[in-house]
């Protein structure tokens, strides 16, 4: 049994609140249970170890219940308490894929991801905090191992959301709601909807409050709390996304009051103590429809061998103070969300689009990183300070690209842009030389008409105008992380962990099956060599997509674990405080004298990682809903459009294609390919026509048309496009499955 060590007795601090006392007691209990000489103790024994008076037993029991519900402690036989991992119980957050499989990200960052089969997920939903009993035969949970861990959900610690959007339907004897989210595995049984502001009709989109769900083998029960309207009613599609992802349409009145109280202009009192950069040639470069300008730059030639670069970032922390209504709401939202038809901002427009936005021809407050950079792109020095600027010009990326594609004019700002391009390209080459991975893919932007229908789909390419700003922001993020780490300040870092070795091995086998040389991908240099090799191959884009799927997802953490994709040991987010709460935290950590505690930052880092993923899912779904309607209209017309596509995966039932023109993927079922009967070759991972010996393999380029849209499952099936001048469907590439040499010649 653990001995009393003569520590400070845990007494109630004079004048402290109950919450503060509870937090102190929680910390003491967790510290005690983590000691190497601790043996499982019951409540009376814990009272002695913590040096608590006997009359505080009820208080201790209440704290233990809270800790147990949070997954921070576990109760075992004899009502004794231990750390959960000692009982093979792991608390963490579960993420579900659309096939129903779960993946637990343990709270303990030293533990590997845990895979949870669909049958073992219990009643967990996507992004719930859960307690998982690990499979004791699996070694993947031990620190430093690479084998995958497996487990089973034994308890829901915290529901991420209890409100679910779906379609109201009727069975023989009861009403039910089919969830829009395919990761919810069952329909939800509901009683006859009560009066919630508008009548509910079968087929309507509704919001359900989840009430009971006892077992994964039974249907959950709920209650309709809001009727959104018919699915084809204008605006209902986006309202469904807003409700499904709990995105607020409006700010609370106290938040708006604080935002409006900041005023509309920078005053002399705001400028006091700042470096005056208003005479500098400061500019912003953003998308043509942007309104929240987070960042600005200025470049100046110091000598033949040196440049001075100023990276100015909007000083949101000057206006949004810790503990205010503005700060509380910003933290709750975590980030701005960019849906296909609107922005759900993190901050009210009085700040995001006005006083904090680095608009041209007005004074604005910034946090500045000033670099001294060698001619070859190496950073020689960086310093940090609050500043005031007066932006000279606002550019769109398209305008900058047009300037960079022509010869420099006498205009000093245009000359600066040409110089910035040359310098940032050198910086970019150094970054890739250091191991940064080239994982850029063209993106798309959907433009809507006044009725919310797709007008056109535009491709966004990461050209030199984007790269110019990207390299400046990466430099600033790295420099700030370096400064924070050198000062040992509690902060939040942007981390992208090294991929799981098992996934890399599986991916390497896929590459080798395509007869492409591939070394040990646990070495970043080999990954770079492979990606460079793939850029020159027709199959390359498909395999690059496969590599992306093998990577970990970037997140926020209080530990500076580095960024694998960027090959940076020190990295954070500093450059977008208008739209990311993480950056606002980092501004405070860098410049404020009173820093937040590590425990508070850890909780915030997990929260904003969740809100970031939530926003990404909402943004994707908002685009998909518009695309589904767009493709359904094509089917109804009888003349669906033709789209270039790339085969990204081959299965025995068909092949998946990526359609860049739609920014989406889908299945081409074999049942729709009518020119032959195709057999799946497991060894070569391709499909071979039994009669013609034609081959369908990874990386093939085809032309497809939409064949089926399933809005419930959020899936689109394609078919090979019908040739304009032929009666039959397009044939797959005519390649013989047994002749590798002839295939390589055609490439």
Task: Write out the residue ranges for each language-model feature.
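Electropositive polyanion-binding surfaces
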Residues: 193, 202, 207, 212-214, ...
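A short macromolecule-binding patch
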Residues: 111-116, 184-191, 663-681
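Non-cytosolic beta-sheet module surface loops
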Residues: 94-96, 168, 646-649, 708-710
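Charge-lined substrate channels and their catalytic hotspots, especially those that engage the 3′ end
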Residues: 10, 18-310, 317-363, 394-395, ...
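Basic Arg/Gly/Lys-rich low-complexity intrinsically disordered segments
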Residues: 1, 11, 16, 20-22, ...
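Internal insertion modules embedded within essential enzymes
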Residues: 143, 166, 217, 708-720
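C-terminal functional regions that serve as terminal interaction/effector modules
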Residues: 695-696, 700, 708
